Amino acid sequence: MVKYQYEFPLDKAGKAGAVKPYRGGKNDFVTPVSNLSGVAEILTNAALKATEAYSQLGQDRLGAVLISKVKGWAYADREGTLFIEESDNNNVWTTTAAVNVAAGVLTATDWVYLSKRYYRFRYVNGNLQQSEFVLYQSVGAGEMDVRVNEKTPLQIDFAENQTHDGRLKVEARKTFDFVFHENAESASEGAALPVDGAAHLLVEVYGTAEMSEVKFWGKSVSGQKLPIRGVKTDDATTASSTLGKAEAWAFDIKGFKEIIMEIISITGGTLSVKGTAVS
């Protein structure tokens, strides 16, 4: 078996974490127990104490390149359990997949397709302290989150959005900007955004007002105004209104006919509310 050496920079917590290994000629070398070079990257090689756990720093899969699936490998001289976990806010985590790792056996998870924004690998050691431990990850990018679990061949009728070889005809997402309020000095509903097939909306609230309140509304097919909740982008809190400024809010607007950002009150300056809708 070919063996490679890697240097592991430490993360800000002082422990080898979610960092890409690289070959170097300085110090802190380790030798992986399996030749996975070019297929996987090493997350950690630090041995764990009895019942100790390793948690990868939360990874945002919606970056410049979409990460659609992940796979993990673990090797240890003591048994343990490898988890793949997901989160919507990089705070509360749920287990998507888990595999028991026997002592002295390089063990892999299946490819796991991701559905939430953040993912991480977590390894929980058993009741005996390790002497050897190494954890790898592989990622798959740019794939659609579609899986078929049928064991028998499926009868397929090609739809209008498919080519004859079964490939999807993909349309690019459409985006458009919209101004709800521009330097408003008084309370008002402002302009209503026609949803027109848009699915997501990012709204910015900013201005010089000393005090203000903006309430978030969605109009249903009957014309009724319904409160909608947005997610504040800097801390992932949710609310149906805001008293702040210099903020950005994300909304799921599917099913509504119009979106309204109503200025309920304003004193001592102006306020602007603008958004970008994505189909």
Curated annotation (Swiss-Prot):
Q: Which domain of life is it from?
A: Bacteria
Family the UniProt entry places it in? To B.subtilis YqxG/YqdC.
* Function, as annotated: Not known; does not seem to be involved in host cell lysis.
Q: What is this protein called?
A: Phage-like element PBSX protein XepA
What organism is listed for this UniProt entry? Bacillus subtilis (strain 168)
